[in-house]
Amino acid sequence: MVTIAIMAQALVVEQSRTVPVTVADAFSGTVPMPLNELFCRWYGPIPPIKAVRDQTGIWDAVGQTRTILLQGGGSMAETLTSFNEPHSFGYTLSDITGPMAALISGVNGEWLFQPAGTGTKITWRWTLHRRSAATAPLLPAFGRLWKGYAGRSLEHLSDLLVG
């Protein structure tokens, strides 16, 4: 399922996929996964993650931060804002550099894990905050691009979780 909603200052996009594993296994398999393993391919102009820096311990405590480095340059600071095992976790992306910085000032992200039949529906949601009024008309195009990126990423996550 794909949803796109435009708010005055932001665009909400989400993508979902049902995976044949339990909610607990989906959550515990997703949270600690190295980002450069999950997000390892280009999708149009959206680059793969090259590396994660400055993370201490496992990613499970609200307030933790890390720096995400992108292929081809660019980076962003990620802060864990919610952690409700095994149902959801949320984060913000800020201090965005590289090509996305011209369009987006920040992102609120959320991963949701819900029972679905004998598996788990995993939903990945981004709220994109525009850089300026001038870039606002470009957000829907980026949102459509992001949903393709998210769909492919969730497909890859499914493959990794099912093994």
State each model region's role.
Residues 9, 103-108:
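Amphipathic hydrophobic-ligand
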Residues 10, 86-88, 117-121:
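A generic structural signal for beta-strand entry/edge sites
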Residues 1-58:
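Hydrophobic ligand-binding cavity/cleft-lining segments
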Residues 93-98, 125-132:
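Short, solvent-exposed aromatic-acidic interface loops
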Residues 15-17, 76-82, 106-115:
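Hydrophobic/aromatic beta-strand elements that line small-molecule binding cavities or substrate pockets
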Residues 37-38, 48-102, 152-163:
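Glycine-rich portal/gate segments that line the openings of hydrophobic small-molecule binding cavities
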Residues 26-30, 66, 80, 91, ...:
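Hydrophobic pocket/interface hotspot
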Residues 127-163:
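A conserved amphipathic terminal alpha-helix motif
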